[in-house]
């Protein structure tokens, strides 16, 4: 269009029709503004009608027929348009279009937001936090801590783009909180029926119930992460860090080991899809750290490393 208009303008001036040329320059500028203002219309309409092949193939974690995803893509087109026309130097835009460089995340660049987080769960769980104007106090059980953690993950994902990471170590202290809580319940139950099973039996009952709570808590994390939809129309991009030597003492380390074991067991099992078939979930990503206490066969936590290896062999996501 611009090349043709250059030729038209040149020919008008070549014939000495300077007044006509002046009017044509004004017309040309006006039409240029109109074209620039409507650069997103076609793409946005194709998104709404689900006929934008680029959007369908762009992100395997986003379903372009879902309303929330379409709204994110629509906002992304507006951001990309503003970024290319106003925010970036033209030479950067041209280099991107020509494939010389790739300018990442233009669909979020217009807004003042960041892309990744290392979430400080420890501070928010130990000292409380605020979510949408509601005070969330320190949880009184491991299961509640897991539920709050997923709410934090969802809030973070909805206010940034990109991934986030949490550490299971920050959940480990709440295993002891649940242990003491369950112990009081078991002791009260035994007292109510006039039975004294002895300390060993009580401890056994407590640990059995504690294991079940850990199972439910980890399951909450797994299923919340893959079923939550954030404001950017997808499940949170989350990585779970599993490092035994982050624990503050041996008691907490053993509790952390129980959480890690359950996380690996549930990942090995997978989640059921809409057909009831066990499949590999895309998230959370799991990072298991090797150290002296889990890297050799005679190490105390070698069983976790074996489980992690089996889990990797069966549930590695090719991304």
Tell me the role of every PLM-derived stretch.
Residues 1-51:
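Charged, amphipathic alpha-helical regulatory modules used
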Residues 30-319:
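Conserved catalytic cores of very large enzyme subunits
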């Amino acid at each position: 269009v611009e090349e043709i208009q250059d030729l038209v303008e040149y020919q008008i001036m070549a014939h000495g029709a300077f007044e006509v040329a002046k009017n044509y320059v004004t017309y040309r500028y006006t039409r240029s503004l109109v074209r620039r203002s409507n650069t997103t219309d076609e793409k946005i309409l194709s998104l709404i009608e689900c006929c934008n092949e680029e959007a369908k193939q762009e992100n395997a974690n986003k379903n372009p027929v879902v309303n929330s995803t379409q709204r994110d893509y629509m906002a992304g087109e507006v951001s990309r348009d503003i970024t290319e026309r106003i925010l970036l130097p033209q030479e950067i835009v041209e280099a991107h279009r020509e494939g010389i460089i790739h300018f990442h995340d233009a669909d979020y660049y217009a807004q003042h937001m960041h892309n990744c987080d290392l979430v400080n769960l420890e501070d928010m769980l130990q000292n409380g936090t605020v979510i949408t104007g509601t005070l969330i106090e320190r949880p009184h059980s491991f299961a509640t801590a897991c539920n709050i953690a997923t709410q934090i993950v969802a809030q973070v994902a909805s206010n940034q783009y990109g991934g986030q990471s949490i550490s299971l170590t920050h959940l480990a202290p709440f295993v002891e909180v649940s242990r003491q809580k369950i112990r009081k319940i078991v002791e009260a139950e035994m007292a109510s029926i006039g039975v004294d099973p002895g300390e060993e039996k009580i401890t056994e009952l407590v640990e059995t119930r504690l294991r079940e709570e850990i199972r439910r808590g980890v399951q909450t994390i797994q299923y919340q992460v893959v079923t939550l939809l954030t404001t950017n129309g997808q499940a949170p991009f989350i990585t779970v860090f599993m490092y035994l030597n982050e624990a503050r003492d041996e008691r907490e380390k053993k509790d952390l080991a129980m959480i890690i074991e359950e996380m690996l067991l549930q990942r090995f099992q997978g989640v059921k899809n809409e057909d009831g078939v066990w499949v590999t979930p895309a998230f959370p990503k799991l990072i298991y750290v090797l150290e002296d206490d889990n890297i050799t066969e005679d190490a105390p936590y070698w069983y976790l490393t074996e489980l992690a290896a089996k889990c990797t062999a069966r549930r590695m996501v090719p991304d």
